[in-house]
């Protein structure tokens, strides 16, 4: 099979939505029956985003095989059916680390190691390997054209276009066409300069996707085509929309996928976008609304919880409910009290690290438990629910996690020192292990208890979900917690680790050690989130007994 490549770059400013644009095109191509994959090349020196601050970089998206990756891979999985792996995202840091490791082993036989050819060759090898077995691979290069960090990646994709042949490669460049109110017109000059910058490193774009707050008229598109040396039909107007799930239809209407198929000589049926039409219909026609409080510590950057945000919206679609997320700083719960949680239809505590705001999260779980408010805890959100239950129901005064209190009498949550990974191998960790790449990561099997809400929601006895944590429930204290009424409704493959807890005498209180948000999609949703949002709707309608 010959793989064709679409290299996606961005110019003018960052955060234009290269990932969304690329994923939307990928969704259309997939809807035409083609086997599509996507890749993200990140120019930063970190080996992966696993230890980067969520308030700087956004969330870390975890793949099935346990790779800690850029949040754009979450967009990819939400738009196309292909599952991402560790091969679909790599950084400059990863490439340099691999090249230096080979140099230390003597693999280069004494050669002087340089950016060209050694680094660029390593990039090309990873791109080819990650794209193997697919009809089309869309490869997104992070950053903005002109950034010094991205130059090795730009050079690598330029070389790939030469080596693979232009009949098997395309360049799609995303730019900004701003509207100046004072002048009363759109300005194309930034796009022209961005393409000029791209040309200076040997890359001629084949498709220009132009972001704007309005439709770019034909005369402006013609002007862009003339000065940027592209076909007029290859200048795609991508105006701002109220839902990212409308973008596949937006670019399909302009024949973008036809340009791709013509270039690669592919004959494929017309795109069937009926699933996306259904998503758009459900989003535009809710029958009610709910407000869900998300109590976290990274709320100044909503992208820190990107997959959770999207999963709540997906669940809203399935329940025909408009979901409003109210972001609440857990430190505010500590300082202002739980009064700020009043009026919410449901409460969600997402994952996180560190002790800042931890007591606020525990208070949020306690408030939901005591006031019959639907509660969904994810990762740390399960652990704080457990701590609250231990302290205030099981009479374990001062109970805490050993992550935050080394001398607590009741360490209901502790460091996992040994577990079985998804491949059946034994993993071991200690307090002295590195922070990066040492957590329990990736998809793991979970056994669901009979009669549990979790089993009812999933409709199966087992399920696989993705993990990212190094602390777990302390099994030594489980008997005391269960005696006090806590229900363990999910266990790991070897049945040694607690994966899900529930409170049976509560209308809807479920908390999971794993991250269900990573497998939610707009077309399919996710059972836990669907059940949670449904419960929020029932609470909003006054159907819960307080």
UniProtKB/Swiss-Prot annotation:
It comes from the Bacteria. Residues 291-542 form the Glutamine amidotransferase type-1 domain. UTP binds at residues 14, 187-192, 223. CTPSs have evolved a hybrid strategy for distinguishing between UTP and CTP. The overlapping regions of the product feedback inhibitory and substrate sites recognize a common feature in both compounds, the triphosphate moiety. To differentiate isosteric substrate and product pyrimidine rings, an additional pocket far from the expected kinase/ligase catalytic site, specifically recognizes the cytosine and ribose portions of the product inhibitor. Pfam families: CTP_synth_N, GATase. Homotetramer. Mg(2+) binds at residues 72, 140. It comes from Aliivibrio salmonicida (strain LFI1238). ATP binds at residues 15-20, 72, 239-241. Belongs to the CTP synthase family. CTP binds at residues 14, 147-149, 187-192, 223. The active site is at 379 (nucleophile), 515, 517. Allosterically activated by GTP, when glutamine is the substrate; GTP has no effect on the reaction when ammonia is the substrate. The allosteric effector GTP functions by stabilizing the protein conformation that binds the tetrahedral intermediate(s) formed during glutamine hydrolysis. Inhibited by the product CTP, via allosteric rather than competitive inhibition. Pathway: Pyrimidine metabolism; CTP biosynthesis via de novo pathway; CTP from UDP: step 2/2. Keywords: ATP-binding, Glutamine amidotransferase, Ligase, Magnesium, Metal-binding, Nucleotide-binding, Pyrimidine biosynthesis. The lineage of its organism: Bacteria, Pseudomonadati, Pseudomonadota, Gammaproteobacteria, Vibrionales. This is CTP synthase. It catalyses: UTP + L-glutamine + ATP + H2O = CTP + L-glutamate + ADP + phosphate + 2 H(+); L-glutamine + H2O = L-glutamate + NH4(+); UTP + NH4(+) + ATP = CTP + ADP + phosphate + 2 H(+).
């Amino acid at each position: 099979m010959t793989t064709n490549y679409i290299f996606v770059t961005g110019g003018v400013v960052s955060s234009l939505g290269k990932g969304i644009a690329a994923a939307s095109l990928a969704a259309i191509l997939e809807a035409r029956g083609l086997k599509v994959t996507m890749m993200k090349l990140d120019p930063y020196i970190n080996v992966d985003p696993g230890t980067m601050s969520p308030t700087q970089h956004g969330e870390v998206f975890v793949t099935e095989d346990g790779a800690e990756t850029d949040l754009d891979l979450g967009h990819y999985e939400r738009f196309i059916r292909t599952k991402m792996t560790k091969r679909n995202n790599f950084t400059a840091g990863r490439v340099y680390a691999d090249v230096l490791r080979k140099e230390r082993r003597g693999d280069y036989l004494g050669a002087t190691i340089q950016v060209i050819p050694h680094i660029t060759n390593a990039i090309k090898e990873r791109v080819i390997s990650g794209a193997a077995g697919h009809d089309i691979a869309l490869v997104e290069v992070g950053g903005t054209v002109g950034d010094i960090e991205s130059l090795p990646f730009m050079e690598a994709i330029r070389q790939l276009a030469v080596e693979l042949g232009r009949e098997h490669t395309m360049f799609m460049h995303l730019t900004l066409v701003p509207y100046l109110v004072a002048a009363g017109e759109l300005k194309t000059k930034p796009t022209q300069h961005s393409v000029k910058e791209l040309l200076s490193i040997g890359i001629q774009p084949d498709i220009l996707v132009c972001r704007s707050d309005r439709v770019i008229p034909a005369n402006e598109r013609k002007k862009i085509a003339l000065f940027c040396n592209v076909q007029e039909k290859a200048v795609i107007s991508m105006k701002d929309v109220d839902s990212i799930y409308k973008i596949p239809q937006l670019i399909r209407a302009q024949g973008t996928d036809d340009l791709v198929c013509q270039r690669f000589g592919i004959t494929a049926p017309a795109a069937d976008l009926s699933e996306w039409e259904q998503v758009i219909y459900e989003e535009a026609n809710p029958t009610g609304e709910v407000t869900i409080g998300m109590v976290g510590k990274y709320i100044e950057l909503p992208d820190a919880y990107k997959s959770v945000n999207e999963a709540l919206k997906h669940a809203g679609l399935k329940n025909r409910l408009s979901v409003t997320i109210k972001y609440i700083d857990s430190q505010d719960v500590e300082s202002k009290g739980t009064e700020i949680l009043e009026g919410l239809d449901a409460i969600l505590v997402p994952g996180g690290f560190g002790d800042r705001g931890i007591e606020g999260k525990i208070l949020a779980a306690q408030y939901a438990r005591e006031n019959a408010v639907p509660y969904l805890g994810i990762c740390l959100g399960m652990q704080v629910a457990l701590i609250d239950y231990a302290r205030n129901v099981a009479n374990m005064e001062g109970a805490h996690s050993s992550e935050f209190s080394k001398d607590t009498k009741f360490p209901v949550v502790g460091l996992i020192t040994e577990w079985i990974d998804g491949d059946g191998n034994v993993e071991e960790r200690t307090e002295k292990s590195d922070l990066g790449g040492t957590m329990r990561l990736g998809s793991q099997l979970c056994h669901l208890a009979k009669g549990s809400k979790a089993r009812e929601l999933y409709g199966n006895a087992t399920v696989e979900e993705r993990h990212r944590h190094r602390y777990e429930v302390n099994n030594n204290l489980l008997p005391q917690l269960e005696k006090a009424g806590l229900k363990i409704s999910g266990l790991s493959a070897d049945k040694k680790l607690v994966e899900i807890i529930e409170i049976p005498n509560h209308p809807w209180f479920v908390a999971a050690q794993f991250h269900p948000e990573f497998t939610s999609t707009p077309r399919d949703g996710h059972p836990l989130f669907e059940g949670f949002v449904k419960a929020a709707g029932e609470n909003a309608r006054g159907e819960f007994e307080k």
